Curated annotation (Swiss-Prot):
pH-dependent activity: Optimum pH is 7.0.
SUPFAM superfamilies: S-adenosyl-L-methionine-dependent methyltransferases (SSF53335)
Protein name from the UniProt record: Protein-L-isoaspartate O-methyltransferase 1
UniProt KW keywords: Cytoplasm, Methyltransferase, S-adenosyl-L-methionine, Transferase
EC numbers: 2.1.1.77
Originating organism: Arabidopsis thaliana (Mouse-ear cress)
NCBIfam families: pimt
Pfam families given in the database record: PCMT (PF01135)
More details: Seeds over-expressing PIMT1 have reduced accumulation of L-isoaspartyl residues in seed proteins and increased seed longevity and germination vigor. Conversely, reduced PIMT1 expression is associated with an increase in the accumulation of L-isoaspartyl residues in proteins, leading to increased sensitivity to aging treatments and loss of seed vigor under stressful germination conditions.
Phylogenetic placement of the source organism: Eukaryota, Viridiplantae, Streptophyta, Embryophyta, Tracheophyta
Length: 230
């Protein structure tokens, strides 16, 4: 997988975002502001490697994605993350991207994370509490729930944006059902070989699907299979 800078060259959150801008990955002010506000270092155990452009293990056979992948997904969803919009983050892990989403949609919007490992949900809430997204958690526009992300989170559907942080063999119907007409879903699809797919829902309920790039994610699976390392 492509790495955009060496491990030793970046050791600050702002410098990480500037590098993403210099490489043309972050192209909008809104995404840059959100990533600058939400310090990635708060969401990883090894802060010395927090800003390296590489995925990092977070336990339970899963990883936090590399910064350039988070930035790419934020850019792909940017027009669907305006203030007041609703966003669902499936496989929310450390809570980092959920926090970025919350900053972008603001207090009038809603950012929902779904993660099926209870321990990760608990630690992600602590991470968010220590971040710039803490006010959104306190007043209720940001929440993280224990659940099977393949089923989405119907309580606050439909969503303007849905992000999936693990690879599904095919796009779960529940996520398409919970996507608002005019909304966008970004999801890695495939088994060994995966594509990051952009799914746009049309006004008549049909969907248009585009392959954005080849990727490698951990599988979107059951909690039991994940803990076994299947």
């Amino acid at each position: 997988m492509k790495q955009f800078w060496s491990p030793s060259s970046i050791n600050k959150n702002k410098a990480m975002v500037e590098n993403l801008q210099n490489h043309g990955i972050v192209t909008s002010d809104e995404v840059a502001k959100a990533m600058e506000a939400v310090d990635r270092g708060v969401f990883v155990t090894d802060r010395s490697s927090a800003y390296v452009d590489s995925p990092m293990s977070i336990g339970y056979n899963v990883t936090i994605s590399a910064p350039h992948m988070h930035a790419m997904c934020l850019q792909l969803l940017e027009k669907h993350l305006k203030p007041g919009m609703r966003v669902l983050d499936v496989g929310s892990g450390t809570g980092y991207l959920t926090a970025c989403f919350a900053v972008m949609v603001g207090t009038e919007g809603r950012a929902i994370g779904v993660e099926h490992i209870p321990e990760l949900v608990a630690s992600s809430v602590k991470n968010i509490e220590a971040s710039a997204a803490s006010p959104f958690l306190k007043e209720g526009s940001l929440a993280v729930h224990v659940g099977d992300g393949r089923q989405g989170w119907a309580e606050f559907a439909p969503y303007d944006a849905i992000h999936v942080g693990a690879a599904a063999p095919e796009i779960p119907e529940a996520l398409i059902d919970q996507l608002k007409p005019g909304g966008r879903l970004v999801i890695p699809v495939g088994n060994i070989f995966q594509d990051l797919q952009v799914v746009d829902k049309n006004s008549d309920g049909s969907v248009s699907i585009k392959d954005e790039t080849s990727v490698r994610y951990v599988p979107l699976t059951s909690r039991e299979a994940q803990l076994r390392g299947d």
